[in-house]
Amino acid sequence: MKKVPIKVCVSNKQKDVPIRVQSAKKLVLCCLQYWKITTDQVYIYFLDDKALAQIHDEVFSDPSLTDTITLPIDSPGISSHPHVLGEAFISPKAAIRFLKDRSQDSDLLYEEISRYVVHSLLHMLGYDDQTPEERKKMRVKENQALCMLREKHALLSD
């Protein structure tokens, strides 16, 4: 049986940070390959704060700003056709605020947004960050993935 390539759908509906769609697709595919995850589809949406706050309100009844929202759909290992791993809604502007609040170099902007994508993918895989232990475990996985992405020159770029 012929293996069908993973369809990574990326939409950029914000103007705060230039995002190269192909760069985002490469990042997602590298992570899924690194983690040995098979799926048919993954959706990544880069949105402005207003749109993300609206989704946050619709899904969680909380209109506050956030950096990412992840909606896992089909868990890894579940048989469905097509298998949709999930959807990630990401605010690049949140990364700008994060770096500014910590007086960090804006050169780290694309790495921070890459972290948001990796973080969302981990949520799609079932990782959670509600407790300090879960956050620590998730941060380790994020850092491992970011290290791999750096080596493969697969972090987001402009």
Swiss-Prot record:
Q: How is the cofactor bound?
A: Binds 1 zinc ion.
The record's annotation in InterPro entries points to:
MetalPrtase_cat_dom_sf_prd, YbeY
The UniProt entry's GO biological process terms, in alphabetical order, are: rRNA processing
Q: What is its EC number?
A: 3.1.-.-
Report the cofactors. Answer: Zn(2+)
Domain of life, source organism: Bacteria
**Role of this protein:** Single strand-specific metallo-endoribonuclease involved in late-stage 70S ribosome quality control and in maturation of the 3' terminus of the 16S rRNA.
* Homology family: Belongs to the endoribonuclease YbeY family.
The protein depicted here goes by the name Endoribonuclease YbeY
Please name the source species.
Answer: Chlamydia felis (strain Fe/C-56)
Q: What is the lineage of its organism?
A: Bacteria, Pseudomonadati, Chlamydiota, Chlamydiia, Chlamydiales
